[in-house]
Amino acid sequence: SVNIEIPTERNLQLLAPDKNYESIYRPMSYIQQGVLQSAEERTRFRHAPRFAPAGQSTQMIVGATDESDRDILLLSSALYGRPTMKRVYYSGFIPVNPYDKRLPALDKAPLVRENRLYQADWLMRFYGFRAEEIADEQTPRLDLDIDPKLAWALRNPAFFPVDVNRADYEALLRVPGIGGKSARLIVSSRRYRTLTQQSLRQIGVVMKKAQYFISCRELTAGQGVNELRPEQVRRLLTAPQRRRQDRNEGQLTLF
């Protein structure tokens, strides 16, 4: 793997003046060319050796510089456009040198932000989301309190409700609480029966989230994201999380 480390060349040169993006992309291109050439040779010669059979990966440091999550995801999306790029990893910045004024004064690594970026990355790779949808110009930073799929749904209430008995697979993937496996089971199961709340739970749909974004026979009218409004749905879904955090913060430590 060849690590990009810093998401923009400007900040890369600020922290490492001897480096630039050309010195990073050159070996990336070399690896890509080798992988593609090896694949072509294997179509002609069965036992031709493989070149980097696992493909490429890279890593970016999150929180060391001022890039937004949108900047990071747009770069990741471009990297995934390369035919041999398999994974982009995100590593929260861990402060170890408090005397370097070029680095932010953080008490700890931004682990929640790192986790949200991995969730957004998953949406791009497996759920058909584009980077510009997950972090748009109005909201360039991911919401740390809710996952990026739910955040997108709350920003786009006009997309909902999704009829689980009629919607295509791609639309189902955009519903909070419905994953890839659940979406596939919905598509296959509804050929033989009309899906209800109970059958959706059995399939594995997280109804606590999905109920505000879907329509099916048993759901009460007026309880969707458009009737309740996104702000209220957000409060309903984050209230249990806040209560858990409050309980944890109220616990005494041993030392």
Each language-model region and where it sits:
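Short alpha-helical segments in extracytoplasmic peptidoglycan/chitin-binding modules
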Residues: 172, 185-186
